[in-house]
Amino acid sequence: FVQFDFPDQNGKPYKSSGGKMVCNPELKREIPEGWGVEKLGDITICHDSKRVPLSSNDRELVKGKIPYYGATGIMDYVNDYIFDGDYVLMAEDGSVMTEKGTPILQRISGKNWVNNHAHVLEPVKNHSCKLLMMLLKDVSVMKIKTGSIQMKINQENMNKIVVPAIPLELLFEINQKLEVIDKQQLNLIEENKQLTQLRDWLLPMLMNGQVKV
């Protein structure tokens, strides 16, 4: 999809089959003819005001099975949640980008707690979380991040990120295909969480001899 080889009207890869591409000055790249651009702030709702950070001491008092997310991943598990739904997280400060200069993204679903080091984005206007991840994964954030030692992507700059605007009829088709992939990936993520929790519970008992193999 990000290489614009989605199925054309004949079911063939659009770009590879000679689909017309036009240069877009805002994106500084070619996009399919008929596509436009839109800002991230126009296709998402940012829920940053709902985030609540917990110190390590605070988290010790509320241990549970609900993931507690930071900028780059799950930091802990707690017994309560702030968010219950489907969201995309974008790292706000600390480690905010990959070695390629693209944003650090996480896809979360269900009950979760997110601290103040990751932006919480809910896609709107017929965009899905999976589609949003794909639109953002190759975007450079080099010019919008601030700071050199303690890097940060503030909400204002994040909302100005431009991404390709997909025609509505194609948007529905793409979302249908991505939904199947998204469900499979979420199932794998959930299985991995359960295995991680099992490991963290079992390993100390193996180390002190409570359990033998």
Question: What are these regions, as identified by a protein language model?
Answer:
Residues 15-53, 58-70, 168-213:
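Non-catalytic DNA-recognition/assembly elements of restriction-modification systems
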Residues 57, 78-79:
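A generic local secondary-structure boundary/capping motif
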Residues 70-74, 80-159:
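A short beta-sheet element
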